[in-house]
Amino acid sequence: YCTPQETTDRLREFVSNGGHLVSTMRSFVTDDEVTVWHDRAPHNLTDVFGMTYNQFTRPNGHVSVEFAGTLAKTPASDAQALIELVTPFDGTDVLAGYGHYVWKDYAAVTRHGFGKGDAEWIATLLDADTIQAVLREAVEHAGIADAGTALAGQVTVRRGTNARGERVT
């Protein structure tokens, strides 16, 4: 929610130089003094995320999130607590939308290429299994999945550094 200008500048540069950024709803709304930014949301990053929003609402009951594209095999899930009404720009991949007659034209999950990288926006709260599937796909898309990723939820892999500074698994 609160983000200093320096942070948005660094995130912009990170994605432009090949980084993969995942962010969630209600990010980049105010500066570090909690003063609301006066440009389009998300502040200083609309072109990075390839979208904007100026409204959000509570789902008040059943509002399904329906997946498409690289997330098409993810089962539909209900939005939880809050939904942003995201308007994607041309060239932005919509990976999920709302299965509700009023909000069907808004995106729930987007991904947009910017520079050498890309940025993904998750515009609602999702249940644990669904957010795990969304984040797993984002990690795979970024090419940073490792051997432990395929075993997530089945085997616990612990990593760390021992007293001698050696990496242990």
Locations of regions flagged by a protein language model:
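A conserved amphipathic helix/loop scaffold
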Residues: 2-169
